[in-house]
Regions:
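A flexible loop/linker signature enriched in serine peptidases of the S9 family
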Residues: 180, 287-289, 306-316, 333-343, ...
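Juxtacatalytic substrate-recognition/specificity segment
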Residues: 16-159, 176-178, 195, 236-239
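Predominantly a core beta-strand signature of beta-propeller blades
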Residues: 275-281, 323-327, 377-381, 421-423, ...
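Active-site-proximal alpha-helical
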Residues: 65, 158-177, 184-246
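Outer-membrane beta-barrel initiation region
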Residues: 568-632
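Blade-terminus and WD-like Trp-Asp/Gly-His loop motifs, strongest in beta-propeller folds
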Residues: 294-302, 348-356, 392-400, 436-444, ...
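Sec-dependent N-terminal signal peptides
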Residues: 3-13
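Beta/coil-rich, acidic/histidine-enriched accessory regions frequently appended to metallopeptidases
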Residues: 22-25, 31-33, 228, 232-339, ...
Length: 632
């Protein structure tokens, strides 16, 4: 599961404080920009190709957004691209601090989009599209300037759920993550009202679901009519009522009925996670949201994991023998070395002797690999000269750690020698890599990637990076071998001594655990969860499996026994997955059409992608701070 995407754009609502929220300017950026018909894309350093990718995605997204809103852009939008989240946190375009999890921001005074590239093209494309929806709504409803709204001259205030929900709906439509969140709400009978969506993180996934219902019942053409009516009446609810014929109270009832019909029939087809695994954390008692990134100790008696029980992301040890929390090793967000614990792309890993745990952390201006003593909490750190470091995994024999590193426009699989601190790039291409795990003898690394069957460093705009397969780096031949080749998402691999590979996949629309006998064609489901599973780890015996499971609006940890012997014959598809290839066409109702409505792709031959445009590099005028309202 692409966990980073689920909470990508709203996690800033969860954590009230972060260490060092006053911005520190570590770097001076020499900005350049490229020009396309509707965008000026600003970049720096060696990120010209990333800027071109951004411009192409933005132009493609703008046409889709305009078609839905029945609106056409008449002024260029500025997009400022940072090559890492660490650089993004230094921006002066908006004054707010950008903690881990804020994937992009739209500044509404000058209608500028600010986004970081964090190694995943899927995430990056989603954020471009999502933030552009905000910029388009701002231009359409407020003339591209929110001053009228703030001064009171404009009365219309678009509800958070209507704004963020549409941004999610248009940028992702519907996927396994959204389905998981909404399915859980329906099954647990915790569906909010339309108005209640404004006061929680459900404004994103819940709002998406409302638009999904509206377009299924009334057609996609209604989206543009809703916003046209909002603008005409200067009232959000009247906009919906005039377009749909129902007020928010009736819309809530209709939406709830739709979801109950959709999901309640699934209850007898699938299992609750507690039906096949033992829960070792309990969010209902600790009142937190995240318990993630579990990792077995070498003896299998302790599980290390990240948790936000105290409002910060901490590293905690849990004893399986006593069933209780043993100790809190690291308190995140409270010191310069633990500014952020990379909980969106986590990876905890024990040393072979069980004396240390490794993880990645933001430490000042750069990321580091931290190795903390499990007995006394002392730690060492190795600064890594990359744009981002994620998901560490300790070599089973040697003093080395594999990790995912992000540099410029790519994320790759790396190894660092802990004795010499030499860093080696193993994959070294443009594709995005994730979730490495070692084989028992250290001769192979299995990982997840969006590379498919492609090789080299192609133009990523023309690559289908929408899903991940599993791959293996074989040190004997120094080559990458593909393990899975499906149109689905495989992730979080974990290998046993017996050459069994466990991983998660959404083959049926729900993220479940699968088992694969390496070297064979046997792939077997071992769970049939009703919600979703991620971030798995198998103990040294290969018998116990720990994972993070989603239920009751959050993530808990579970341990499953006899993982080698479990098997499910059939796991039925969800409705959205069975209909995922259906094409939902609708009429383009914009008044002016300068392009063929059924064009398959955009012609970029007339675009100006010039390296000679510079934006006053010494003054950085476009990086001057405004006390501006923002939309995430």
């Amino acid at each position: 599961m692409k966990f980073v995407i689920i909470y990508l754009l709203f996690s800033q609502m969860i954590f009230g404080q972060n260490f060092g929220q006053n911005k520190v300017q570590y770097n001076t950026f020499d900005w350049e920009y490229i020009v396309s018909p509707n965008f000026n894309v600003y970049y720096y350093g060696d990120n010209y190709d990333l800027a071109v990718f951004t411009s192409k995605v933005a132009e493609e997204s703008l046409d889709q957004i305009g078609k839905h809103l029945r609106w056409r852009s008449n002024k260029p939008v500025k997009i400022i691209v940072y090559s890492s989240h660490n650089d993004f946190q230094q921006t002066n375009i908006v004054g707010a601090y950008m903690p881990e999890g804020v994937g992009g921001v739209t500044e509404l005074y000058k209608n500028r989009i600010v986004i970081p590239f964090e190694g995943s093209y899927t995430q990056f494309k989603h954020v471009i599209h999502h933030e552009l929806v905000h910029a388009c709504i701002n231009d359409m409803m407020y003339g591209g300037n929110a001053q009228g709204l703030i001064s009171g001259r404009i009365l219309l205030q678009i509800p958070l759920w209507a704004n963020e929900g549409l941004a999610e709906f248009l940028s992702t439509d519907w996927d396994s993550e959204t389905d998981m969140v909404v399915r859980d709400l329906a099954i647990e009978e915790q569906l909010p009202t339309i108005n209640q969506l404004n006061y929680s993180i459900l404004a994103y996934k819940g709002g998406n679901s409302v638009y999904q219902y509206i377009t299924e019942k009334y057609g996609r053409e209604k989206i543009g009519e809703i916003f046209q009516q909002m603008k005409r009446t200067q009232n959000a609810e009247k906009g919906f009522q005039n377009a749909l014929g129902v007020d928010f109270e009736q819309l809530t009832k209709d939406w709830h009925d739709y979801l109950k019909k959709e999901y309640w029939s699934d209850i007898n087809k699938r299992e609750k996670i507690t039906d096949f695994a033992d829960k070792i954390t309990d969010r209902t008692k600790t009142r937190n949201f995240y318990n993630v990134s579990p990792a077995f100790s070498p003896d299998g008696n302790t599980v290390a994991y990240f948790t936000d029980q105290n409002g910060y992301m901490d590293l905690v040890l849990h004893s399986l023998d006593s069933g209780k929390q043993k100790k809190r090793l690291i308190r995140g967000n409270t010191s310069p070395d633990f500014e952020e614990l990379k909980w969106l792309q986590p990876g905890l890993s024990w040393s072979p002797d069980g004396k240390f745990i490794a993880f990645a952390s933001k430490s000042g201006k750069e990321d580091s690999i931290i190795m903390v003593n499990t007995q006394n909490g002392d730690y060492d750190k190795i600064p890594i000269a990359l744009d981002g470091v994620f998901t560490t995994v300790w070599h089973p024999i040697e003093n080395k750690i594999a990790f995912i590193g992000h540099k410029d426009n790519a994320s790759d699989l790396y190894i660092v020698d802990l004795d010499t601190q030499e860093v080696i790039n193993l994959t070294n291409d443009t594709f995005s890599d994730f979730s490495p795990t070692w084989s028992d003898d250290g001769s192979r690394i299995v990982f997840s990637s969006d590379r498919g069957s492609s090789t080299g460093s192609p133009d990523m705009f023309n690559v289908d990076f929408s899903q991940r397969d599993l791959f293996m780096y074989d040190f004997a031949i120094e080559e990458i071998v593909q393990i899975t080749d499906t149109p689905y998402n495989e992730d979080y691999p974990s290998l046993t001594k017996d050459n069994l590979l466990f991983y998660t996949a959404d083959y049926n629309g729900v993220y479940n655990i699968f088992r694969h006998e390496m070297g064979s064609e046997i792939f077997s489901p071992i769970t049939n969860a009703i919600t979703g599973i991620q971030q798995i780890d198998v103990d040294s015996s290969g018998d116990k499996l720990v994972f993070s499971g989603y239920s009751e609006r959050g993530w808990d940890l579970f341990v499953m026994s006899q993982a080698q012997n479990r098997e499910k014959e059939v796991i039925p598809e969800t409705r959205f997955y069975s209909e995922r290839n259906d094409v939902d066409t609708f009429e383009d109702l914009r008044f002016v059409k300068t392009e063929k409505p059924n064009e398959e792709s955009q012609d970029y031959s007339q675009y100006i992608f010039s390296r000679n445009y510079r934006r006053f590099n010494d003054t950085n005028k476009d990086d001057e701070q405004d006390p501006a309202p923002v939309s995430y």
